[in-house]
Amino acid sequence: MEDGGLGMDAELGADSARRKMEAAGEALEIVPLEMYDSARAKIAANLRWLFAKAFGIDHIPEDLRDPFYRDQYEQEHIKPPVIRLLLSCELYCRVCALILKGDQVASLQSHQSVIQALSRKGIYVMEDDDTPVTDSDLTCQPIKMSSHIPMIDALMMAYTVEMISIEKVVSCVKRFSTFSASKELPFDLEDAMIFWINKVNLKMREITEKEHKSKQHLLESPSHQKSPSKWYWKLVPVRYRRDHASGRQLPYFQMLEDLIRDVCDGAALLTVVHYYCPELMKLDDICLKEVTSIADSLYNIQLLKEFANEYLNKSFYLTLEDLLYAPPVLKHNVMVFIAELFWWFEIVKPEFVQPRDVQEFKDARAVSQPKSARPTVPISNATKRSFLVSPGAADPVLPVQNSPEVCNSNKGSSGFSPSHPLLPLRQRQKKAQPAEESTACRNRSNSLTQEGHPRGSVAWSDKRQRPLSQLNRYVLHSATDSDADLASGDSVSLTCSISEDSLASTVTPKHQSHPGQGSVRRINGHSLLGNVNMDEEEELVAIARADPSKNDITLTNSEDTERQGVTPGAKSIWGRQEDASSDSRTASFFLEPLMPAVLRPAKEKSISLNKEEESGEGRQRGSTRRVAGAESAASSTRRRPPQTLNRTFTPNTSSEFETTIEPKSSEFVPPAPGQMQAFRPLVTSSVEPSSAERSPGFYLHSSVTEEKRPVQAWDAHPGTSDIETVETIEEQDAELTKELHPDKKQHFEEEVESAKLREDMNVKEHEDKDGGSRCSSPGQQSQVSSVASGSIRMTSFAERKMQRFGSNQDIRSSTSSSQRTTPDGSESCPLPLTSWRMKRDQSPTPQNKDNANMLASELVQLHMQLEEKRRAIESQKKKMEILTARQRLKLGKAAFLHIVKKGKSDTLPQPTKSEFYLKEGQKLNEEKEVSSKDDTCVDALRDRSKEAEEPEKASCEWAGGGTVSSSPLDVEEEVDLNECNRSIELLNEAIGSIQQQMMQLSLQQEMLMKQNIQSPTSATSPLANDQINTSEPRVRASIHFVEPSGSPVVRKPPKLSSARPRSKPSELLLGKEHSKGQKSSTPTPTDSPSARSIQGGRTPKAESQDFVQSSVRSESFNKDKGNHKGTTFHLNDEANMRMVSREPSSVALGVTFEESMSLRDTETTFDDGTARDNLISSEDISRGKANLIEVDLSDLAANTDDESTNALDVTADGSDGEKKSGMGFFFKDEQKAEDELAKKRAAFLLKQQRKAEEARLRKQQLEAESEQKRDETRRKAEEERIRKEEEKARRELIKQEYLRKKQLELCEEQEQPQPKPKTKPKKQRLKSVVKEEPSIDPLPKCPAANENLISAQSGSSLSLASVATTEPDSVNSGGAGSQRGESVESFPGLSRNSSRTTERDWDNGSTASSITSTSMAEYTGPKLFKEPSAKSNKPIIHNAISHCCLAGKVNEPQKNSILEELERCESNHLMILFRDSGCQFRALYSYFPDTEEIHKLTGTGPKSITKKMIDKLYKYSSDRKQFTVIPAKTVSVSVDALTIHNHLWQAKRPAGPKKSAK
């Protein structure tokens, strides 16, 4: 549809077309400008046109095709046969006969008869000097080409007049544009052509802008319900946003001012051609630039020539150079070509002429249908059929908005059945319908579904709209890496930024490309990807019409297009349908029709969509995405959104970004692992992917699936449909696998999926059954982790299964450890489970079906749905923030008091937790509160609720240390509140000792900083930690506190820095020193998940501020299975530091006081295993190894940042009053605590010192700048004062000079002798000679230059240099006050004299100053005259008429009448109209400078003269009594006379050199 695609697209298309032309051997060779002979070109062009019209373009005799020949001296001559034809007038008669009608043709016997026939039509054959061409001129020998060329020009003009007229142009323009009849009506044919071309170009500009805006409306308008607006773009890399939207400018449509000069690049004419023939001339094939190069112009001209040769009967009679250089002599040739264009497009109108304005009208009707006008009743089949465009109908431009005009040109495609009506299911159809309706209901499915599939195999019912991105994990199980076109390594859809599982959508296996889909369907010759620079960034463009009911959006992906052989550069977005031949193009490009929606609540109003639906199949992405290979994974990594957008999706703590990035990822290099955040884009769409080919592995409605459903599936409620069943089964079998192999850290995506997410979904699935979207799906791993590494090439489902179940460790890539914060999913699914994968092993269904094409439209669906979610999230943002802040305080206090009061549970009471979460979900109408929690918290919650019946499985929940005690509460009584108090006292003592040591720290700073550098583990930056974590499977010695993957809207971590409060998408504490001096045992299978949870995180820069990390080394207790050696216990209680009892709930190893301001701020979850035993070990306590020490977190933050490579100045940011945001309890090694605190204090003092130094330097710099400004102000004031004094003196000089000249003028008028000036100037000269030096010296030297400049600006062309350098006696011949000669003429006040003399000097080039000459004693010249700028020029005109124009006795009667009229006229400014450059007087005009109108007073000429009519301007020189041409284009009050263009005069008799006016 969008023939007006973006400017970049036009250039791309033009470039690619140019490349194709050159590749085809059509590289153009042109004559350089310096070798171009315009006279020869004029002869050749005229003869070419003449022969074409006389003989017919295809029947020109061979010897006449080239009218020139070269003689033996290499001189070019016209061939004798051509000369004979011209002399015989045969050609002229033939061509003239084409124009004349009836009897007149018979009279054409000679040159004279042709001349007379033309003159009868008002066209006179005139030579350049306005002498008429006669018969003898045309027949004389040797041939006189200077007469034959005007003859052919006159014929061309007559031909032009026949084809185009002002009336025709106006009537045609009226059809598609508006104009002001009083101002814009053309006054001649040339103006009419400019008018027509400009209006067409304006119309095209309007069309492209409208299309661009409507596209933007789809993408950005918040009122558009399904548009992926702000939130969608926030997930998109900046690179894509720049390419995609407002950064790209529209094509430049040029407005002509001069016909010949402005059409020479071909762009304007090609735009006209495109407007009338959009099917034949694509807009993106035209090079539309504001400044076109010669190559671009040549390309355009060549395109124009080819079009004219192919479709317009070879009517382009010029060469490429002729139009490129466009010499003025070829004006008639260009005009006749434009006239032919007009004639073809507006008069003849062949069938290929289909102007865009007609289609725009159709579009307007389609677009005008409101999106909200949804029928409330089902639509009949007849109505469905009526929506379809008949194949024979004219293909309309498909609107961006919803339109009933469906691209129903897919009859030949095997992927689409023409019998499937393109309408959605009826309302509330929950089960598979009979064959004719079940599958046919999906617009998207129809364009993707193979007819061979059973109709009943819809993958889910209409009731449940599942996220389009969350396809079955087996959809592309058998695709190999080779299916992903490696040339398009960046071809992953931008949806990867939105849905972590969308990689599958970017691969269409080769075996799935149907014969009818061999190439991308170019709608109107442009693929749907044209708005993306596919050559550089193989982005998946996701723009199409939204269907209001299903958000069905058509899109393609670049990999498909690449594979299918379409040159990316040639693609443009939104083409129109080409014709029936495009029927067989790729089905995923079919734009969807406007469809009635099934009535269901808006998603914004019910935002708690069942998470089973939202995410259940998202976990299957491992296989789906894996087929795309590491390359796709890398590109999906590249597409990660920036960190600051974290609030719209869930951070994930698993190290998803650690995939090896392909070198191809040039556009977006992921941050260093230390700053990397594993983004979890929200999967908030709920779109129904296509049905039949969805997942050949199983069908929800098939009997096999039904039979294999486990009884225990969480599908109890009637509203829970088959989808939930399958999702539950998949969860269960994934978790079973995890139980079997808990140590696989690099499992594929399914295993990595957080068990917490499944728990969450099942808890919430019944309460938000009807679902809106949810905010996030944190458990789902990103695409990156799903593609373990580039080395893994999954080629079949069987291999995947083998690799999953077999413990082949070689599968796992060390860089892609899909580590989960939840070590094991066993607790999430406590019921007896049957492995769905095992069942699938027995399933006979083939796995190599055509499943990928469906993803095309679904991906854009996701964008649209994400926009819905974004709006819902934003609309409740404030409410949620208030609520979460309140809840944070409440829960923080409750949890803290619960701990202090020695509660019997290790977390919040179970009813409190579950009720709170359920209530919160309901209260917010969305699932942020639950779904966005980190795995650890949710699993902990589920663990508590199921501990009684699943004590064994609970062991895996916090397998941080290894073995788990069978009873979670068996050690509660051992910790006494007194011990806690004693710990507090120890903490206070430690703080006191720290204060005492502060004086020593300045001496120790150097040493300590060196130690920091030398200790590799303590100074390890988050980058290093991440690298270690991802490459080493060993268990870290300290438990890190995991930031839940919650939406930060709900869960804001305490801010230690106000500078970057929101850059925390994935917040996992990494202890900077936690591995120092530690040994960690090799993890056992039970350790491994915990290791995953520790290693998986990223610590971005902001995290190192917001989540203060201090991992303290404690004595290691190696119990059964590799315990953690140290513990980090952060209690981030916003209210206050409080006493914490030393009961298990406060000292258990896995305590998770999450560092966020969210629901579970103080919820603590513990590992029941040996870590607890370690901590409560009396030996430990007695040795003081695990003593509780209170340290202000903000103190530690400084050191943390010092030690990290991020090097953020926490003290600069955090000391602004936010230090108090958190206090923490740490179990520290007492012996080493002082050293560590000393290091921290040293770093803190060092920073403070550095800051003070910087502040001092800044202050000095500011003072220096202010002093400099004061000096500058003083200097300027002094300069101003001096300038004013000089100006005053200058004005005095001007006044004196003026008075002297006035006196001279009066004397001259009275014709009195001037005795005084003779003697006076001599005296003055003597005085001034004496005073010359002193008068110039005190003044600065710059005034002379300034005065020269002023003089030049005032219009004077006097040579100031000559004036300034003349001898003192001549320079200073001025009046009494003149001390410097140049000062007189250079003052603005004297510009009257100087400018007048300047204009006088244009002709003779005199540089003598008139001021100097008039001021000389001997001066007796003509009288001075006044500048007419502010006064009347009547005296000048009077003088001119009397002494120049109408001088002499013969003209006296006319002169007297003219002068009388002149006296009567009240106008101040008058102008004389001359016939031509001979200055024959024709009329007198009055000029009104305000309106710039010129109206006739008396004489012969047009009533008024417009700007376009003026040819030359003249100035009258009173002293020389003659007119001089002014080298100017604009009329002003200094103009005294003018001429108009020759063609505006109509001669009464051709013979007379002077014609009477109209």
From Swiss-Prot:
Disordered, as annotated region: 400-464, 504-523, 551-585, 602-675, 737-790, 803-850, 943-968, 1041-1131, 1257-1293, 1305-1344, 1360-1414
Entry-linked Pfam families: CAMSAP_CC1, CAMSAP_CH, CAMSAP_CKK
Matches recorded under SUPFAM superfamilies: Calponin-homology domain, CH-domain, PRC-barrel domain
Domain notes from UniProt: The CKK domain binds microtubules.
Gene Ontology, cellular component aspect: cytoplasm; microtubule
Compositional bias (Low complexity): 776-790, 812-822, 1080-1090
Keywords per UniProt: Coiled coil, Cytoplasm, Cytoskeleton, Microtubule
Coiled coil stretches, renumbered: 849-887, 971-1004, 1243-1303
Family to which the UniProt record says this protein belongs: Belongs to the CAMSAP1 family.
Disulfide bridges in this chain: none
Biased composition (Basic and acidic residues): 602-620, 737-772, 943-955
Segments forming domain CKK: 1421-1555
InterPro entries in alphabetical order: CAMSAP, CAMSAP-like_CH_dom, CAMSAP_CC1, CH_dom, CH_dom_sf, CKK_dom_sf, CKK_domain, PRC_barrel-like_sf
Localization annotation: Cytoplasm, Cytoskeleton
Alphabetized GO MF terms: calmodulin binding; microtubule binding; microtubule minus-end binding; spectrin binding
Sequence ranges assigned to domain Calponin-homology (CH) in this UniProt record: 231-346
Principal subcellular localization: cytoplasm
GO biological process, one term: neuron projection development
Function of the protein: Key microtubule-organizing protein that specifically binds the minus-end of non-centrosomal microtubules and regulates their dynamics and organization. Specifically recognizes growing microtubule minus-ends and stabilizes microtubules. Acts on free microtubule minus-ends that are not capped by microtubule-nucleating proteins or other factors and protects microtubule minus-ends from depolymerization.
Comp. bias intervals (Basic residues): 1317-1328
Protein name as catalogued: Calmodulin-regulated spectrin-associated protein 1-B
Polar residues bias (residue ranges): 400-417, 440-450, 504-516, 643-658, 1106-1115
